From Swiss-Prot:
This is Thymidine kinase. The lineage of its organism: Bacteria, Pseudomonadati, Pseudomonadota, Alphaproteobacteria, Rhodobacterales. It is found in: Cytoplasm. Homotetramer. GO terms for molecular function: ATP binding; thymidine kinase activity; zinc ion binding. The gene is tdk.
Length: 195
């Protein structure tokens, strides 16, 4: 039975590496996969998913106005596809997550999403919130803070190296802009969040 999966973490935990490894495992067994990523994430090149360890693969892109059910349906009509893998899933809209759930339920294709749980302010992304509500299975991908504790938060740093508390929720960046921390060190970096 097909399921909707959400593999979540903070930055630099290896989510894209795990996605690419899962795709490779299917391909190695003679099955095709359908990779999706946001059209504005060009860190590995437009229409590519890349990992920090140097592996990458081509992917179809989507905008926040695309109907992901329609994209998956069209891909399945073009030929067999064993699995859909979505990178940077936090950037999907709530409606797009529902479209993925519909693809799982109505088209019978497993969908594996990989993304951040919270942003640099400690708030859920809309796509992540919807996935936490709708996913059949959720898996935490672990990484560590500089202190050795499990990192569950991320800060965005400015050019001066200081943590930022304001700004757009979506800003594509990598190791130079984001640092994964445990909650204690997140609070030390940005201060306590007002209740």
């Amino acid at each position: 039975m097909a399921k909707l999966y959400f593999n979540y973490s903070t930055m630099n935990a290896g989510k894209s590496t795990l996605l690419l490894q899962a795709s490779y495992n299917y391909i190695e067994r003679g099955m095709q996969t359908y990779l999706l990523t946001a059209n504005f994430d060009d860190r590995a090149g437009m229409g590519r998913i890349g990992s920090r360890i140097g592996i990458e693969a081509e992917a179809d892109t989507y905008t926040q106005s695309d109907d992901l059910f329609a994209k998956i349906d069209a891909r399945l009509k073009a030929g067999p596809c064993a699995c859909v893998l979505v990178d940077e899933a936090q950037w999907m809209t709530r409606d797009q997550v529902w479209q993925l759930a519909r693809a799982v339920d109505d088209l019978g294709v497993p969908v594996m999403c990989y993304g951040l749980r919270v942003d640099f302010r400690g708030e859920l992304f809309p796509g992540s919130a919807a996935l936490l509500a709708l996913a059949d299975e959720m898996r935490e991908v672990r990484t560590i803070c500089h202190c050795g504790r499990k990192a569950t938060m991320v800060i965005r740093v400015g050019e001066d190296g200081n943590a930022l508390a304001e700004g757009a929720q979506i800003e594509v960046g990598g190791n130079d802009r984001y640092i994964s921390l445990c909650r204690k060190h997140f609070r030390e970096a940005v201060g306590d969040v007002p209740v």
